């Protein structure tokens, strides 16, 4: 399974500037994930739409508290722009956004009852 690299720094946790590496094709795949729900985001996945399974959890041992954001460079080296995004909250709720153009979208807002990609 291809590895998904998270090269952005978790801005909500660490107060240092985000570090990112430009993709070989020059396209920005950096997406800000904003947790505007009342729950903690426990898991975060981003997989190319062509993948049959979810890539590894991008948060690892970390979580994203309510009201916080992270910045992630979603680039697994395939030069793909269309990804499926998935989050798992601490209450078991799963949120998904399918077929997201991460080369154009810059923010995924996870709300209490709805989600949006901007």
Describe these PLM feature segments:
Residues 31-40:
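Asparagine-centered strand-capping/turn motif at beta-strand->loop junctions
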Residues 52-78:
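Intrinsically disordered, low-complexity Pro/Gly/Ser/Thr-rich segments with frequent PxxP/GP/PP motifs
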Residues 1-4:
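Positively charged n-region of N-terminal signal peptides that target proteins for export
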């Amino acid at each position: 399974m291809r590895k998904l690299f998270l090269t952005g720094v978790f801005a909500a946790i660490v107060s240092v500037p985000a570090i990112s590496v430009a993709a070989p094709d020059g396209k920005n795949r950096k997406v800000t994930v904003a947790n505007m729900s009342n729950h903690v985001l426990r898991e975060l996945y981003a997989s190319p739409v062509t993948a049959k399974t979810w890539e590894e959890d991008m948060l690892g041992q970390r979580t994203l508290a309510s009201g916080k954001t992270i910045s992630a460079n979603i680039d697994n080296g395939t030069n793909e722009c269309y990804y499926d995004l998935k989050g798992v909250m601490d209450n078991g709720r799963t949120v998904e956004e399918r077929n997201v153009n991460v080369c154009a979208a810059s923010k995924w807002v996870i709300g209490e009852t709805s989600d949006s990609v901007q």
